[in-house]
């Protein structure tokens, strides 16, 4: 498993599926938004094709969680846009944001952490089958404790599933 610089549409769909699984483990209903500079094809560019294709892959797989995209971050998070996009259950309600690449994810994470009053936990490594988290440089004590808590919780889930198999 690797962290993808620029994920393919299949990798983006897999990231969404793995993210939904983690969100469910924490007791929440996943509402996944694929983020972009474009909102639902306006403007339609080559850069957004992977995101649109990932959404189609998830539709074909008939996954058991809500998702939509591509959309800009404000559309994903601010309910005032529901009137403009009434066809989407995700607009204004997203609790998972899938970025089009590692660079945009890193920039967005640092911006949220620096400018937001909301507690940001992460970045989380998902899909490794092990409770591994990496504390970024300049992590606070609180950040490290949150990542350790996520790893401990993940470990208990992984151990529980392994015991059920045996």
Whereabouts are the PLM-identified features?
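Active-site rim loops that border cofactor/substrate pockets in soluble metabolic enzymes
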Residues: 1, 37-96
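Charged, alpha-helix-enriched surfaces in structured cytosolic catalytic cores
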Residues: 14, 46, 106
